[in-house]
Structure formats: structure tokens, C-alpha cells
From Swiss-Prot:
The lineage of its organism: Bacteria, Bacillati, Mycoplasmatota, Mollicutes, Mycoplasmataceae. It catalyses: tRNA(Leu) + L-leucine + ATP = L-leucyl-tRNA(Leu) + AMP + diphosphate. This is Leucine--tRNA ligase. A motif ('KMSKS' region) lies at residues 580-584. NCBIfam families: leuS_bact (TIGR00396). It is found in: Cytoplasm. Its main location: cytoplasm.
Length: 804
């Protein structure tokens, strides 16, 4: 007889809720903070890809709870963002109402899956009680000089009516487009809020060393931060200084021209009148190109001579100044000294435009750029020195002669922190009549979004909030002010949500971050012990949240500077056709349908059994069927069976061996092999007369099963005569002495050659060993017909038969 998954799931979900089984406890010294990357509550709801990561954290949370840990396993909603606003624009609905409806749908799906979330810890980044703290943190960043309002080059998306951060842009056909919707993106100068994450570049780099993260993610962050030690050299053009950052100041004698990024603010100042039209056209052409295309070395180099010259401070030569899209404005100073003899891109550019090439490092082949090591030539006082020696000498010379300075440079740019959209956190900022910035008082937080129909982007660079005059205009006493009308990006709320869970007393009810109670809780729970989510957040959310955590740590509010000690990236679940699930492919699997036909337990078990957690694998309905079939086998094994209270010891070895292996495998997140071990145990149990099987071994199996298929495990636990939740039981222990086999393999030889082996109990005497050898079929074949036989036996090792 098979079990009814619908009846069992409904029964136990009701039990868990009524008995508050998953409430966060605070009774043990040991803690486990296990966290999912919280979802954006889209209209589409959960898909089976979400289920994979959420099931993994649920398995681990249940495991640590049974091991006696206080477990914090919360869930919440990354609720602000473009999709809700885009939907609201199409339908005329308020994005807040749309988001709340989606959250209810998402939550219902999570409950159906039997996840062990503490819903008293539920948070919503778009709830005013939540973003009150987001606004307060922004104020602290501003007070410390880490938030600035600047006129800067930004990524402008006309279709979305807002600026986008670098991590929100992708490349398509050589052009920049928005990650959401793939709309065109261009460079544009605008006044924007930025957070000076660059001030924390060194801390963010060093902090990676002690994190248990995938090396690939750490390398992505290191490369994104991009620390370079070098020198900034001043090239003069009349009375204008052109600072150039280089890691190879030793090649300055080979610098034969200067190249500026087209966006560099010096370009128009340096361009001669006869070149102005040509330069402006080139700047406009470059604005649409993606960084990937501009850095592509295989592309034919383009550029324009701007009509001006600079002086090489070492050679005193007059060299041309060009602009080209292969130089990026957001690295260094947006200018390079071109050394075509020793840089491939400079070589390609110089050969195309017939510019001078001077070798300053010795090479036998001067037909192409030489980028290897060698002695310096044509370099005055650097001649005959190698790279390391010459760098030290030239850096000292440049600083001593006031030609520049040693400098550390980062590829990391400051975080663009404002958006020209309605649906985001309002800034706690006012402007007086002289445009001075005034921070809103703490007592007046949160600044909430108004109820309005003006949510359509203006496409002029202003937020829709600028149209809501009764919200924008504020009178305090007899003074009039205007509110900041830009809103914060979606990444604001997600940069500290892991802290908010700790502060939550009940749904969206947070205690004061600066309170003594907050300090006590934060000291207990931080950092997050296990964080599971996708690698695509490596240089966005994972970097921003580290920055905010470091900042709050420096304020003395947090006990640790790093938010996530252990990070794991789960693989994707692909469609049955081995392609990424997509509505356009028609290969999306809806978990609601699977729960209806197979049940949540089978779905959970299948996704954890598919393969390694970090592997991306195709969906298989055959695999799902097999998971349900095995769960039914488990049910039949226990249903209506009276097990023995006396241990006949037949299953001692396999049970204790499985418990040990499963414990280790769960710790290492090797869930598929842990399930394989449970199958080994079930097979062994079925080989016995079920009524003779030791009941504590059956109970231990049910405890282990509960990690993966909690509804069925609760039902089986009850059928075994227990009246409390299996979730709250202690994790099964194993007896190491029962795992050590009391047998040994004996080698059977004839004239010193191995002919067979036998397995016997340790300590078996010589006479018995010889007798067993004489009865062995393989040995009989080799000694048959021989009479003069000599037997040499060594206990626990060998029997050698010598034919004389």
C-alpha cells in the first residue's frame, strides 16, 4: 500500500504551524545561521530551480537542529525593483499591492514544500518598518563621507527611464543593454548619489582570505576590485596636467603618444578647434559601445588625433594626444601613456595610424610588440636594469623630481546608488533653496512613498516622484525644502537583510539596530554560517553586502566585519531538453504541478538526489518517479510493522556505517551520496525479517529521512508510536566499534603465487586456516595429484602451500 502524499502533507504542515515547531530557539551555546538568497517575489512564482537551493538549506537546517544547535533559518522578500514597477505601468496597479499579492503566492508555495522557516522572522525590504533602517544606514554613510552627490558618467537606459549600475548591464552584439529587458544603454552625465565603496577596497580584498567561499567567486571579486600597484605620471599639455596611471613606469622612455578615453573630461579642453567636430562625432559613436567590445583586442583599432600635444616628462619629447575607445575612463585616470613596442593594443594602434615605436626592453624580434622580460635599452639611467630593478629606480626618480607619485589603483568603481524610478526606498534627504543637503531627522524616518498615479518614468533624468509636488515640497517651521526625488536601488535593501532577520521579533517588526538587545543578538548569530545562492551575484549583492557589513562593523554595531562565513553556489536545474528553463522554450517545470502529482517529499528528495549540489543537470520525470517509488517502499517497510526491542546485531555494521557516512556527507553538502546511503540501509533492512529488526535502528533511519522528506518522516515517526515531532529529536549516533569489521582477508598461495583469498574472523588459528585452504576450490585445482605438500600458515595474513 502506498502513502497519500496530499493527506500527509496537509496534516503535518498544519501540525508544524500550530505547534510553532520551527521557531528560532536561544537555549544552546551552539548556533547555526543558515540562509537562502532571498527571492524577488515575481508574478511567476517559484520554479523548480528555486526549490533546489531552498531544499538544500532546509536539509542543512534540520540537520543542525537535530544536532542540538540553535538554528536561525529565515525567509523574506527582496521586494523593491523594476519588474513590479514595469508590471504596474502596464496594468495601472500600484506596485506595492502587486508585490504583496506575489508575496502571498510565494509564501504559500514555500509552505507547501515543508520548508522549516521561522515565519516570525519574515521581512520585506519594501515595508516602511524595514526601509526605515535602510534610510538610517544611508544617513550614517553620508555622515562618514561615504555617500556623495556627484555629476558623473552613468549608464542611462531611456526605455527604463533610469540609470543602471555596471552589474545591471550586459553586452549584446557589441552594445550595452540592460540585464532586465535588454534595452539599449548609453553613457550620459548626470547628478547622482554614489557610495564610496572604493574606500573599502583594501578591506574587501583582505577579508576574502579567511572566507570559506568557492575560489571562483573570490577570484571574481578580486578581479572586480582589481588592485594594481603602480605610479601616476604627470604629462603636461601647455598648462593642463594629464595624470597617467601605469603599472609599468619603467617603460616611460618608450611612451610615444598619449591616449585618452573618449569620456575623459580633459578631451574637450585639449581638443583644438579644427578637430572639435571629428572628436565629438567619435565620442557619440563610442557612447553606445559595451566595455566588452571596447576591450576586445581582435577588433580593429579606431581613434582620433585631437590636435594637441603633451610633453613626455622623461624624454622631454613632444608627443601626440589621441582619443580611442580601447581606453576606458573608469580605470586609472582615463588616460594611458602608449608604449607600442611593449603593449599589443598600443602596437596595433600605432601601426594603423603610423605613430612612432621605440623599443626600451631588449628583444631579438622587433617585428611585433615584445611583452616579455629583458634588460632595458634606450632608457638612459635604466639601461641594463631588469624590470624589478628599473621599477624601483623610476618610481624613486619620479617622486624625487615631482613628476608624479607612487599609487595604488583599483578597477572597482564607486557604487552608483540612485535610480530615477518610483518604486524604491526614498532618500532621507532634503534640499534648501540654495541646494544644500539636509538630512531628515531620525524621528521623522521612515520617509515613505506617496500614494500617487505618477509612477511613469519621465525619461528626462528626473524621477516620477518629481511630479508629486505635495510630497516633494516640505515646510519645516518657516523654511521650505524639497525632497530628493531619486530612489535607492534594489541592492540597498538586500545589503543588510541578513541582519534584519536577527532584529525581527515578528513579521516586519524590527528592534533598534543600536540597542543593547540588538548587540546581544548580533553577537550570537553573526556571521551567517552557511549561505546558498547563485554565483551570478558575485560582484553585485555579495560585494555590496560585504561593504555594508564592514561599514557597520566600523561603527561598532556588528561583532564581525564579514557577513557570510561559508558560501555555496548551487547548480541550475535545466529543462528536460537540457536547456535553461524559459517560457520561450516551453520547458519550465512548475513545482505546484509536481507537488500535486508526486508530492513535496518526492520533489525534495529528487532534487537532492539528482547529482552534486553544485552541478547543473536536466530535469527528468523518470528520476522523479523513481524518488516517489522509493518513498513508497520506505512507507511499506514501516507501516503496520511491529519492530523488535531486542537487538539481534545483524544490522549493527550497516546501520552504524550509514549513520557515520550520512553525518559526514550532510556536513559536506553531499546530499546525493547521503541519500544513496539511506537506500543502502533500506535494502539491508528488507533482507531481514522485518519484525526482527531492532526498532531504534528504524527510528534512526526515519530521523535521517526527515531531512529530505519531512512530511513522510513525521508520519512514520508517529506510526512508530512517538507523539512528538521527529524534527525536534536528537540526530542518531553511531558506535565506532560496530563499524570496525572483525574479519580479515587471508591470501592463499601455491608456491608463493596468489591463487585465492578467504575472509575469516581475526585470530583464526593456523590449523583452521590450513583446513579452509584445503577446502578452497581454486587451491584444490592447483594441488590435485600432488602428495608432498608443505603448509606454512601465518595467523591473520597468509597460507602458503609448497609443492615439494
Amino acid at each position: 500500500m502506498d502513502f497519500s502524499h496530499k493527506a500527509i502533507e496537509k496534516k503535518w504542515q498544519k501540525y508544524w504551524k500550530e505547534n510553532n515547531v520551527y521557531k528560532t530557539t536561544d537555549s544552546n551555546h551552539k548556533k547555526a545561521y543558515v540562509l537562502d538568497m532571498f527571492p524577488y517575489p515575481s508574478g511567476a512564482g517559484l520554479h523548480v530551480g528555486h526549490i533546489k537551493g531552498y531544499t538544500a538549506t532546509d536539509v542543512y537546517s534540520r540537520f543542525k537542529r537535530m544536532q542540538g544547535y540553535d538554528v536561525l533559518h529565515p525567509i523574506g522578500w527582496d521586494a523593491f525593483g523594476l519588474p513590479a514597477e514595469q508590471y504596474a505601468l502596464k496594468t495601472g496597479n500600484d506596485p506595492r499591492d502587486f508585490t504583496l499579492k506575489n508575496i502571498e503566492n510565494f509564501k504559500a508555495q514555500l509552505v507547501k514544500m515543508g520548508f522549516s522557516y521561522d515565519y516570525d522572522k519574515e521581512i520585506n525590504t519594501a515595508d516602511p518598518n524595514y526601509y526605515k533602517v535602510t534610510q538610517w544606514i544611508f544617513k550614517e554613510l553620508y555622515k562618514k563621507g561615504l555617500a556623495e552627490n556627484r555629476n558623473i558618467d552613468v549608464n542611462w537606459c531611456q526605455e527604463l527611464g533610469t540609470v543602471l549600475a555596471n552589474d545591471e548591464i550586459i553586452e549584446k552584439d557589441g552594445l550595452m543593454v540592460s540585464e532586465r529587458g535588454e534595452y539599449p544603454v548609453v553613457k550620459k552625465k548626470m547628478r547622482q548619489w554614489v557610495l564610496k565603496i572604493t574606500d573599502y577596497a583594501d578591506k574587501l580584498l583582505k577579508g576574502l582570505d579567511n572566507l570559506d567561499w568557492p575560489n571562483s567567486v573570490k577570484e571574481l571579486q578580486r578581479n572586480w576590485i582589481g588592485k594594481s600597484e603602480g605610479c601616476e605620471i604627470n604629462f603636461k599639455s601647455n598648462d593642463i596636467n594629464i595624470p597617467v596611471f601605469t603599472t609599468r613606469a619603467d617603460t616611460v622612455f618608450g611612451a610615444t603618444y598619449i591616449v585618452l578615453a573618449p569620456e575623459n573630461e580633459l578631451v574637450l579642453k585639449l581638443t583644438t578647434p579644427n578637430k572639435l567636430d571629428e572628436v565629438k562625432k567619435y565620442i557619440e559613436l563610442t557612447a553606445n559601445k559595451s566595455e566588452i567590445e571596447r576591450k576586445d583586442e581582435s577588433k580593429t583599432k579606431t581613434g582620433v588625433f585631437i590636435g594637441s600635444y603633451a610633453i613626455n616628462p622623461l624624454t622631454k619629447e613632444q608627443i601626440q594626444i589621441w582619443i580611442s575607445d580601447y581606453v576606458l575612463n573608469d580605470y586609472g585616470s582615463g588616460a594611458i601613456m602608449a608604449v607600442p613596442a611593449h603593449d599589443k593594443r598600443d602596437w596595433d594602434f600605432a601601426t594603423k595610424f603610423n605613430l612612432p615605436i621605440r623599443f626600451v626592453i631588449s628583444t631579438k624580434d622587433e617585428s611585433k610588440a615584445f611583452v616579455g622580460e629583458g634588460k632595458h635599452i634606450n632608457s638612459e639611467f635604466l639601461n641594463d636594469l631588469d624590470r624589478i630593478q628599473s621599477l624601483q629606480v623610476i618610481h624613486d626618480y619620479i617622486e624625487k623630481n615631482n613628476l608624479g607619485k607612487k599609487k595604488t589603483n583599483y578597477k572597482l568603481r564607486d557604487w552608483l546608488f540612485s535610480r530615477q524610478r518610483f518604486y524604491g526606498e526614498p532618500f532621507p534627504v532634503l534640499y534648501d533653496k540654495d541646494n544644500n543637503i539636509i538630512l531628515v531627522e531620525d524621528d521623522d524616518l521612515p520617509i515613505t512613498l506617496p500614494k500617487t498615479d505618477y509612477i511613469k518614468p519621465t525619461n528626462t533624468g528626473e524621477s516620477p516622484l518629481a511630479n508629486v509636488k505635495n510630497w516633494v515640497n516640505v515646510k519645516i517651521g518657516d523654511r521650505e525644502y524639497k525632497r530628493e526625488t531619486n530612489t535607492m536601488p534594489q541592492s540597498a535593501g538586500s545589503s543588510w537583510y541578513f541582519i534584519a532577520y536577527i532584529l525581527a521579533n515578528s513579521k516586519n517588526n524590527l528592534i533598534d539596530l543600536t540597542s543593547d538587545e540588538a548587540k546581544k543578538r548580533l553577537e550570537k548569530w553573526l556571521p551567517v554560517d552557511l549561505y546558498i545562492g547563485g554565483q551570478e551575484h558575485a560582484v553585485g549583492h555579495l560585494l555590496y553586502s560585504r561593504f555594508w557589513t564592514h561599514f557597520l562593523y566600523d561603527l561598532g554595531l556588528l561583532p564581525t566585519s564579514e557577513p557570510f562565513q561559508r558560501l555555496f553556489n548551487q547548480g541550475m536545474i535545466l529543462g528536460p531538453d537540457n536547456r535553461k528553463m524559459s517560457k520561450s522554450w516551453g520547458n519550465v517545470i512548475n513545482p505546484d504541478d509536481v507537488i500535486d502529482t508526486h508530492g513535496a517529499d518526492a520533489l525534495r528528495l529528487y532534487e537532492m538526489f539528482m547529482g552534486p549540489l553544485d552541478a547543473s543537470l536536466p530535469w527528468s520525470f523518470d528520476g522523479l518517479d523513481a524518488s516517489l517509488k522509493w518513498l513508497n517502499r520506505c512507507y511499506r517497510m514501516i507501516n503496520k510493522i511491529e519492530f523488535s526491542n531486542t537487538n539481534n546485531h545483524k544490522l549493527d555494521y550497516v546501520y552504524n556505517d550509514v549513520v557515520k557516512k550520512v553525518t559526514q556527507m550532510i556536513t559536506e553538502l553531499k546530499f546525493n551520496t547521503a541519500i544513496s546511503q539511506l537506500m543502502v540501509l533500506v535494502n539491508a533492512i528488507y533482507k531481514e525479517e522485518l519484525s526482527t529488526v531492532y526498532k531504534p535502528y528504524i527510528e534512526g533511519f526515519v530521523k535521517m529521512l526527515s531531512l529530505f522528506s519531512p512530511h513522510l518522516a513525521e508520519e512514520l515517526w508517529e506510526k512508530l508510536g512517538n507523539n512528538s515531532s521527529v524534527t525536534l529529536q536528537a540526530w542518531p549516533e553511531f558506535d565506532e566499534t560496530k563499524i570496525v569489521k572483525n574479519t580479515v582477508v587471508i591470501a592463499l598461495q601455491v608456491n608463493g603465487k596468489l591463487r585465492s583469498t578467504i575472509e575469516v574472523e581475526k585470530g583464526t588459528d593456523k590449523e583452521t586456516l590450513i583446513k579452509l585452504a584445503q577446502e578452497n576450490e581454486n587451491i584444490i585445482r592447483f594441488i590435485k595429484g600432488h602428495k608432498n605438500l608443505k603448509y606454512i600458515a601465518v595467523v591473520d595474513r597468509i597460507v602458503n602451500i609448497v609443492i615439494e
